[in-house]
C-alpha cells in the first residue's frame, strides 16, 4: 500500500535551525498527517547527531524514509573516484544511524570538462562503477541506494534507465521525481511510464510552465534544459500531469512512499497540507 511522505526540503527556510529546525520539521510533518519524512543534508546529518533524527521520529510516530545527498561519480581519475565513493559510503553510515531505509545520491554534476567525448555515454562507465560499489556497501547495512532524475545531465528517462542497467545491482534503483522530467523538457507521464519498473521511491512535484520564446517571467522561475521557464507549484496546480503520473505508478504495482517535494513560493504551512490532500485524492483515481 502506497504511503505518504514529505521531504524536509519542502519546508524551505523553516528547516533552518533558527526557525523550526530539523527536529521541529519532523514534528510538523507528523502534525500535518504524513506517514513518513525524508531528509536532505543538514546540521543533524552527521555521525554525531544522526541518531537524534531517528529518536525524534520514533517519539512523534513518523517513519524516517530516505536521505538525499550530493555526489559526483563522473570522475576519470581513479583516485578522485575512489575518494568520492568513500565519502558517499560514509554518508550511508549516517543514513543507517538516521534509521532510513533508502539513500539517494547524485551521480554527476555535468559532462566532462573537455572539448571532445563529453557526452553521457562517456561518463557512464565511471558513474556506474562508483554507484555499484556504493550499492554493494549499502546493501550490507540494509539501505537501498538510488539515482534521481535531476540535475539536467542525468535527468532524461532513457539516460536514467541506461544508468540503472549499467550498474546492474539489485540494491540500486530509481528515485522517480514525477515533475523533474520537465526540467529535461520531457513529457512527465511518458517518462514516468518508462521509469516505473525501476522505482524504489517517488517524489511528487509539479511546475508552472512558460515557453522559452517568451520574456523571462521574473523571480522564482528557472530554465529547463532547452530554455523554457518553470516555477514550482503545488501538486495538481501546474501542468506536470501529476495525477496521471501517480496513476501510472499505482497501476505499475508500486507500493512504496510518495513524497511531496514542494518548490513553490506559497507559504509552506498552507501549501503542504493542500499538497497532501491532492496526493491522497490522486491515489484514489
Where are these regions (language model features)?
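Boundary/entry segment of secreted carbohydrate-active catalytic domains
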Residues: 1-19
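Conserved, mostly hydrophobic/aromatic
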Residues: 6, 29, 37, 57, ...
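Acidic-and-aromatic substrate-binding clefts and catalytic sites of carbohydrate-active enzymes
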Residues: 13-18, 39-50, 72-82, 111-115, ...
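Short, acidic/polar
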Residues: 15-29, 82-93, 184-192, 242-245
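Catalytic domains of carbohydrate-active enzymes, especially glycoside hydrolases
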Residues: 21-42, 98-99
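Acidic/histidine-rich catalytic cores of soluble enzymes
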Residues: 36-37, 67, 132-239, 281
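Active-site acidic/histidine proton-transfer and metal-coordination neighborhood
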Residues: 55-63, 78-174, 183, 243
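C-terminal helical cap(s) of enzyme catalytic domains, especially alpha/beta-barrels
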Residues: 269-285
Amino acid at each position: 500500500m502506497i504511503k505518504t511522505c514529505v521531504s524536509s526540503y519542502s519546508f524551505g527556510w523553516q528547516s533552518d535551525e533558527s526557525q523550526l529546525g530539523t527536529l521541529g520539521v519532523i514534528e510538523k510533518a507528523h502534525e500535518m498527517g504524513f506517514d513518513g519524512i525524508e531528509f536532505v543534508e543538514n546540521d543533524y546529518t552527521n555521525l554525531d547527531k544522526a541518531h537524534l533524527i531517528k529518536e525524534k521520529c520514533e517519539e512523534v510516530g513518523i517513519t524516517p524514509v530516505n536521505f538525499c545527498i550530493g555526489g559526483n561519480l563522473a570522475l576519470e581519475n581513479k583516485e578522485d573516484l575512489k575518494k568520492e565513493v568513500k565519502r558517499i559510503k560514509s554518508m550511508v553510515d549516517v543514513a543507517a544511524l538516521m534509521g532510513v531505509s533508502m539513500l539517494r545520491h547524485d551521480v554527476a554534476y555535468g559532462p566532462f570538462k573537455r572539448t571532445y567525448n563529453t557526452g553521457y555515454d562517456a561518463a557512464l562507465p565511471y558513474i556506474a562503477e562508483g554507484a555499484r560499489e556504493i550499492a554493494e556497501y549499502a546493501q550490507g547495512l540494509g539501505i537501498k541506494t538510488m539515482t534521481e532524475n535531476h540535475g539536467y545531465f542525468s535527468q532524461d528517462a532513457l539516460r536514467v534507465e541506461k544508468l540503472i542497467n549499467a550498474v546492474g545491482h539489485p540494491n540500486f534503483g530509481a528515485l522517480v521525481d514525477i515533475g523533474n522530467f520537465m526540467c529535461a523538457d520531457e513529457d512527465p507521464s511518458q517518462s514516468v511510464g518508462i521509469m516505473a519498473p525501476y522505482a524504489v521511491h517517488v517524489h511528487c512535484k509539479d511546475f508552472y510552465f512558460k515557453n522559452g520564446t517568451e520574456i523571462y517571467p521574473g523571480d522564482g522561475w528557472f530554465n529547463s534544459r532547452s530554455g523554457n521557464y518553470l516555477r514550482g507549484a503545488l501538486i495538481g496546480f501546474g501542468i506536470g500531469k501529476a495525477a496521471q503520473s501517480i496513476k501510472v505508478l499505482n497501476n505499475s504495482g508500486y507500493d512504496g512512499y510518495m513524497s511531496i517535494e514542494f518548490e513553490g513560493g506559497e507559504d509552506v504551512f498552507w501549501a503542504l497540507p493542500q499538497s497532501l490532500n491532492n496526493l491522497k485524492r490522486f491515489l484514489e483515481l
